[in-house]
Each structure stands twice: as C-alpha cells, then as structure tokens.
Swiss-Prot record:
SUPFAM superfamilies per the UniProt record, alphabetical: Glucocorticoid receptor-like (DNA-binding domain)
Protein known as: Transcription factor GATA-5
Pfam families: GATA, GATA-N
Origin organism lineage: Eukaryota, Metazoa, Chordata, Craniata, Vertebrata
Stretches with biased composition (Low complexity): 87-101, 309-323
Length: 404
C-alpha cells in the first residue's frame, strides 16, 4: 500500500523544490519523519529527497517497507531522544536512508525492533505540540515541559508569516509573561510613576503638560496656563488680622488698637474712629475725643413679646375708634331730639332714657358721657305731673326719646 504512495507522482513537487529542508535535520544526517496523521500528504514528496534513481530502490527494499508499515513517525534532531547516544555514523532506526548492502537490513530490523516500539510509545506523549508550521528558522524553545537543551531550533521550508517572525523577539513560556507584566501594569495605571516638574507632586486629580511636554500637576498646569509662568513654590504668608497687625499706628490719634484700619487722603493709616470722623465731617478728629477703650455700639436686644404686646394694643385702639364715633353720633342725636321734644314729654323722656337699651349698650362698652345741665333744664311747671297724661306716658313707649 505504501509502495504505491511512495512511487506516486505529486502535482505540487515544483512548489517544494527543496523538500530536504523538512526531511533532514540541519545538524545531523539522520532523516526526519512526520507523524502518521501526516503520512498520506508527505509520502508523495519522498522521491524528491534523493536522486531519481534511488526512489524505486527505497520502495522495493524490505526494511523500508516494514518500517513504514509499522509507524514512520521517528525522531529527528528535535526529538526527546537525541541521536548523540549512538556512535557517529550510526542511524537511529533499523533501516538506512539509502538502500543498504546485502544482509544488513534484516538483521538490523530484528535487533532494534524492541527499541523502536519503545520509542514509539514515548513519541505518543507529545502528539501535537511538536508539530510546528513550516517557516523560517526560529530560535524559540518548546513549551515549559521540555528543557531548552533538548529542543534546539527548527529549520523549515517555504512558509513565512509576520506573526511567526514576531515570535522570535518574544521569550517563550512564563518568563516572557513576567517581563511584560510591569509595562502592562503601568499602562493600566497611567498616573503612576509621574512627578510634577515644578512642585514635585506625585499625585494630582489631573496630570497636565507644559510647553516642553513635561508633566505638571493640576495646580501648576492651571497656573502656567492662566499666567504663562511657572507657579511659585513659596507660599505667601498668612495675613494677620486687622487688630493684630504689628507696626501700625494711627497717624491722627496714634493708637495701635482698632477694629478696622483705614487710610486717609494721603494714604496714611488711621484708626476706624478717625477715618469715619474724617469721612463724615471732612476734618480730622479732635484728640480730645480719643478714648482708651474701643467704644462699641450698644444695641438693644430685640424682645418679641414686647413687640407683640404693642401691636395688640394698636389693634385694640383701632377697633375701638369706630365705637367712639358711633357713640358721639348717638349722643348728638339725643341732644337734638331733646331740644325738639315738647315740655309735656320731657319728664317721661328722662325716665324712659334711664331704662333704654342704648344706656345698656353704653354701660357695657364702659363709655362715660357727661350731660351738661343746660341741655336738660326743665321748669317746675313742666316737671309737675299733669292729670290724665302721666299714666298713659308711663305705659306707652311712643316717645321718640324712648325709641331711640
């Protein structure tokens, strides 16, 4: 079966003109064979490994056919079992690469058959990681379970890719990840490790840059942007309160204690009292008005109860004013009617007036009225009772004064 595959002509032999690059190791002369899964695709290229006259002899030899039927996945220069254990010139397999001489193939197959089967079992432990794409020579090592001295560099043929070339500069395995951890951490936190070139701050809400590209903190960057100069590093001293400023003295009264320092028209410092006096009167304050202590304004405390009481009395006065007006108008009416009343009705009128509802209303409102005696001056003749009329007047209430 494999003889026909080995002798078959491949349509793509022109593409892989230098097929010996992947069938032979660059360091030794031992052949490199592929795994059984790739055998159908790789066997058509076997005739191109050697000159054309050797291909039929390779297929017809018994040792070659037996080895291919068993498993042609052998060990090259990159296998876990290096060829250094064999003497120079000896092959790793029970067959030779070229057609051997008479009597050499059969005895080698019987002698090394057990070693070859054991090597196949060890080869099955690494089925896929050893399969590398065909490309340029890469100095990278195998994964972490193989040491670098066991896995030398590979040499493969016409497969090229920019991704594979990028792998040359990256160390393989975990050491490469450890080295790239620090730059990734700094990229994730871009503010770490920066320092303001002006004030030396290490942390700021926002990093800025000056005209030359140096980092500035937020305060220095804003100051530089607004004023065009670097932010001063020396902070201004805190100003003392107006009453504790040392060395100040009023130019008018020569006092050093005041609640507020002012300046006169000449720019000289003056105390609050002298400054206000000059501002209000236009003349300097007399020295006789100087006092040792500061006079403060005596403000009376606001009493809400007193304000409320005064407002209540005002309301009562306002409410009682219409009552006074009505009482005065009613008194005027009484005077007018009394002057117009007849002398006959004068006596009963006074009697009925004492018991009228108007008197009760006046008494309830606590209003006192003074009646002048000339308004109610009656003669004795008018006050004397007349026969036949006194009883009727006392019982009837038709009198105008009584109705009022």
């Amino acid at each position: 079966m494999y003889q026909s595959l080995a002798l078959a002509q491949s349509p793509g032999q022109g593409t892989y003109a230098d097929s010996g690059a992947f069938l032979h190791s660059s360091g030794t002369g031992s052949p490199v064979f592929v795994a059984p899964t790739r055998m159908p695709s790789m066997l058509p290229y076997l005739p191109s490994c050697e000159p054309g006259s050797q291909a039929p002899a390779l297929a017809a030899h018994s040792s070659w056919t037996q080895a291919v039927a068993a498993d042609s996945s052998a060990f090259g220069s990159g296998s876990p079992h290096p060829p250094a254990a064999h003497p120079p010139g000896a092959t790793t397999f029970p067959f030779a690469h070229s057609p051997p001489g008479s009597g050499s193939g059969g005895s080698a197959g019987v002698r090394d058959g057990g070693a070859f089967q054991g090597a196949l079992l060890a080869r099955e432990q690494y089925p896929t990681p050893l399969g590398r794409p065909m490309g340029a020579s890469y100095p990278t090592t195998y994964p972490a379970y193989m040491s670098s001295d066991v896995a030398p560099s590979w040499t493969s043929g016409a497969f090229d890719s920019s991704i594979l070339h990028g792998l040359q500069a990256r160390p393989g395995g975990l050491p490469g990840r450890r080295t790239s951890f620090v730059p990734d951490f700094l990229e994730e936190f871009p503010g770490e490790g920066r320092e303001c070139v002006n004030c030396g701050a290490l942390s700021t809400p926002l990093w800025r840059r000056d005209g030359t590209g140096h980092y500035l903190c937020n305060a220095c960057g804003l100051y530089h942007k607004m004023n065009g100069v670097n932010r001063p590093l020396v902070r201004p001293q805190k100003r003392l309160s107006s009453s504790r400023r040392s060395g100040l003295c009023c130019s008018n009264c020569h006092t050093a204690t005041t609640t507020l320092w002012r300046r006169n028209s000449e720019g000289e410092p003056v105390c609050n009292a002298c400054g206000l006096y000059m501002k209000l009167h236009g003349v300097p304050r007399p020295l006789a008005m100087k006092k040792e202590s500061i006079q403060t304004r005596k403000r009376k405390p606001k009493n809400p109860a007193k304000i409320k009481g005064s407002s209540g009395s005002t309301a009562n006065t306002t409410a009682s004013s219409p009552t006074l007006l009505n009482s005065e108008s009613s008194a005027t009416t009484l005077k007018a009617e009394s002057s117009l009343a007849s002398p006959v009705c004068a006596g009963p009128t006074i009697t009925s007036q004492a018991s009228s509802p108007a008197d009760e209303s006046l008494a309830s409102s606590h209003l006192e009225f003074k009646f002048e005696p000339e308004d109610f001056a009656f003669t004795s003749s008018s006050m004397s009772p007349q026969a036949g009329l006194s009883g009727v007047l006392r019982q009837e209430t038709w009198c105008a004064l009584a109705l009022a």
